Amino acid sequence: MQNFEVIIGIEVHTALNTKTKMFSNTPTSHKSMANTLINEIDLALPGTLPSVNQEVVHKGLFLANALHMHTNHQFIAFDRKHYYYLDLPKGYQITQNYFPIGQNGYIQITDENNNPKKIRIKQIHLEEDTAKQTSVNNQVYLDYNRAGWPLIEIVSEADLRSAQETVLFLEELRKILLFNDISDAKMEDGSLRVDVNISIRPRGAKSFGTKVEIKNINSISNVAKAINYEYNRQLNLILLNQSVEQQTRRFDDSTNTTVFMRSKNDAINYRYIRELNIAPIYLSDEYVSQLLSTKPYSINDLRQELLQKGLVSSAIEQLLGDGPLFKAFKYVNKIVNNPSSVYKWLCLEFIGLINKNTQIIEDISMELLQKIGAMIVLFDQTLINGKQTKTILEKIYLTNKDPQTLIKELGFEQITDENEITNLWNQILANNQEMLLQYEERPDRVEKFFMGEMMKLTKAQANPTISFNILKKILQK
């Protein structure tokens, strides 16, 4: 319906990729057995006190900077959010209610008319995660490995106007989290959880409609489905002259619908108070400036740099949206220093190769990536051709041998001796006098013909650059 518009704000919880939890030295891992990564602080045993993980604060400041925010670094304090539930051993959650670490930022996206649009971000704040609940046969099982895992909650203003804009916002946020090494941002592991606040109003109206919150959506595609369903649900109520109730709902991905959870009239009073077991942290401007200088690039700086080095936009966005692939790309490009070539051989050819074997880039060792880098250097130096490079890439993957060894084993060693190549040209030209006479009229065609003859004669082992340069000298005499 063109007469109504949707108003969307979102809240995103992202789990930080720190080595230990937020207030204890317990390691963090998504892959460990249930209830094996816990200690007395995580379980809130009597007499325990929290100690702030420095890395969590640093990552909060990095994200605030990446989102163009004002940081409250001169007074970093924590608060208690009280509620009683199985997943919260203390009976309260340590969060930041009164002094969030970052305020008043934005993410820029491209709207549906292809115009730049800034989506304001109200605040980001640090908090600890709760235990993970699993319900089986009417019984609830708790895994406290997740309890105390550090989170950042990102709260946007209600600036989004469609499911498409919301998806673009989340994709850009995810790239920022990956680029700044703040989170692995894997929704399948629960590292990125999204709540959507949605209302509709007559187009042109200033006041908001009644807001409905959709909790814990587990994929970006489901965010779009939830918004579109909820828009139509609310619109149908309005067209039937029924009121939209303020509710909390969840998205059911088996039916692609939102399902009632509770009325907002039943909203919990969290009774926020200061967390006095954690002293405020005072960071100077100089400290924060020095910290932020360790990440001099913004994500847009990197986009421009890669564009200037020949990568197309679609390739850049693929890299920025895949943290492990981008990490491998950076590592190999340090060896090669040619982003376009690295993208072709690593991100297209090699990824296609490992996908056939149901592997992912995280499975690949740095040693193997180093050998791929050395292979790409040889290709860029025209010491091997494209067909040979593809064969060598497969052999590196299967045997873990270095490219120079494989070149010898496969008989791909090139003829680079100029005297030998000159003698070969004399032989080829002597056998093709008629074509030689056509050079002045059709130089490109003649050069192409002779290069083909050289490759045939040497079984593609003559170095093409050296061969072509010698041919030009002979033909221009």
From Swiss-Prot:
InterPro entries: Asn/Gln-tRNA_amidoTrfase_suB/E, Asn/Gln-tRNA_Trfase_suB/E_cat, Asn/Gln_amidotransferase, Asn/Gln_tRNA_amidoTrase-B-like, GatB, GatB_Yqey_C_2, Gln-tRNA_amidoTrfase_suB_CS, Gln_synth/guanido_kin_cat_dom. The keyword Nucleotide-binding applies. Pfam families: GatB_N, GatB_Yqey. Belongs to the GatB/GatE family. GatB subfamily. Disulfide bonds: none annotated. This is Aspartyl/glutamyl-tRNA(Asn/Gln) amidotransferase subunit B. Keywords: ATP-binding, Ligase, Nucleotide-binding, Protein biosynthesis. Allows the formation of correctly charged Asn-tRNA(Asn) or Gln-tRNA(Gln) through the transamidation of misacylated Asp-tRNA(Asn) or Glu-tRNA(Gln) in organisms which lack either or both of asparaginyl-tRNA or glutaminyl-tRNA synthetases. The reaction takes place in the presence of glutamine and ATP through an activated phospho-Asp-tRNA(Asn) or phospho-Glu-tRNA(Gln). Heterotrimer of A, B and C subunits. Its EC number is 6.3.5.-. One of its GO terms (biological process) is glutaminyl-tRNAGln biosynthesis via transamidation. It comes from Ureaplasma urealyticum serovar 10 (strain ATCC 33699 / Western). SUPFAM superfamilies: GatB/YqeY motif, Glutamine synthetase/guanido kinase. It catalyses: L-glutamyl-tRNA(Gln) + L-glutamine + ATP + H2O = L-glutaminyl-tRNA(Gln) + L-glutamate + ADP + phosphate + H(+); L-aspartyl-tRNA(Asn) + L-glutamine + ATP + H2O = L-asparaginyl-tRNA(Asn) + L-glutamate + ADP + phosphate + 2 H(+). One of its GO terms (molecular function) is ATP binding. It comes from the Bacteria.
